[in-house]
Amino acid sequence: MLKRTYIRTLTEDLALSLQSLGFVLELRRTQVGIFKAENAIKIKSSDEITKNFIEKKSIKIEAILDDILVLDATDDQAQRIKYGQKCVFDYEEDVSFLWVRYNGTLLAIGSLNKSCFNSLRVFNLL
């Protein structure tokens, strides 16, 4: 299906084009981005949740952010971002959503306006 396809509306439109009535009996989302229903983890008890379990079953954050622009930060840029300060990147285009990586690790998500990075969220993963 195409992004932003409204199945209920599509069903109603199809029914109207057939000069009939129609409705959706059952609708189930099976995928959102890279997340698929068949990859869902079923947990029967909290005892199952161990560090090894989480490391084995988790999707790496880099895989989730794979289709979003990433910029690599220098030491100075990373320090400024950690302190909540704006910093300038050598990137000309304005970007409404991107992530910044430092030493291969997610540092922050935010936007870029006139080469100035504005953090939306800074992570403490380093």
Swiss-Prot record:
SUPFAM superfamilies: Pseudouridine synthase (SSF55120)
Gene3D superfamilies per the UniProt record, alphabetical: Pseudouridine synthase
Record GO terms (molecular function): catalytic activity, acting on RNA; pseudouridine synthase activity; RNA binding
UniProt organism field: Rickettsia prowazekii (strain Madrid E)
InterPro entries referenced in this protein's UniProt entry, alphabetically: PsdUridine_synth_cat_dom_sf, TruB_C
Superkingdom, natural source: Bacteria
Name of a matching Pfam family: TruB_C_2
UniProt-recorded name of the protein: Uncharacterized protein RP502
Any single GO BP term: pseudouridine synthesis
